[in-house]
A protein has these predicted regions:
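Acyl-donor (CoA/ACP) binding surface of acyl/acetyltransferases
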Residues: 1-28, 64, 68-159
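Conserved GNAT-fold acetyl-CoA-binding loop/helix
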Residues: 30-52, 63
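Generic structural signal for well-ordered alpha-helical scaffold segments
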Residues: 51-54, 117
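Short loop/turn motifs at secondary-structure junctions and domain boundaries
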Residues: 55-60
Length: 159
């Protein structure tokens, strides 16, 4: 199996049994550097976040998808669009630090926006992302994916 095949992934809706994998990712100091979750996040907090993600999906206010490696079934991150109000949503994502710099998140975002109407039932005109100004990797990623800097946000128009 080639290295490329090892990084092939699928996206699927998050579920409660993903709690441990997501918690492990969020506890990683390299992930915490630019993430907006508290450093002392508990597994219970993550379970509650997942419950909220599931409820937002059913209320057509967002979706969170996990990134699953095809080769192993391992959850290596998540991506979501949430707080969908009046055609505008917020983007959030995290990736296991083991996979930083491998181009996975760009492929994830490309897939998310390519299949947006499949993943997000609510109509969307734009997606915003809040990024720490020191997070050059995420800024580069968002730029490659068509986001534009606007005030303190990064914006992608999708309609």
């Amino acid at each position: 199996m080639s290295n490329h095949d090892d990084l092939a992934f699928d996206l699927r809706p998050i579920r409660h049994r993903d709690c441990q994998a997501i918690w492990d990712i969020l506890k990683d100091p390299q992930v915490q550097t630019f993430n907006d979750y508290d450093a002392d996040i508990t597994k219970g907090n993550v379970y509650d976040f997942i419950q909220g993600d599931i409820e937002r999906f059913y209320n057509q206010q967002g979706i969170r998808l996990v990134i699953v490696l095809r080769s192993s079934g391992q959850v290596i991150g998540s991506v979501g669009i949430f707080n969908i109000i009046d055609g505008q949503g917020m983007l959030g994502f995290e990736l296991s630090s083991q996979y930083f710099g491998k181009g996975i998140m760009q492929k994830v975002l490309d897939m998310l926006f390519e299949k947006l109407t499949t993943f997000v039932p609510a109509p969307l005109n734009s997606v915003l992302a809040l990024v720490n100004q020191n997070n050059s990797a995420s800024i580069k990623l968002l730029t490659k994916c068509g986001f534009q800097e606007h005030d303190a946000h990064w914006v992608k128009y999708v309609s």
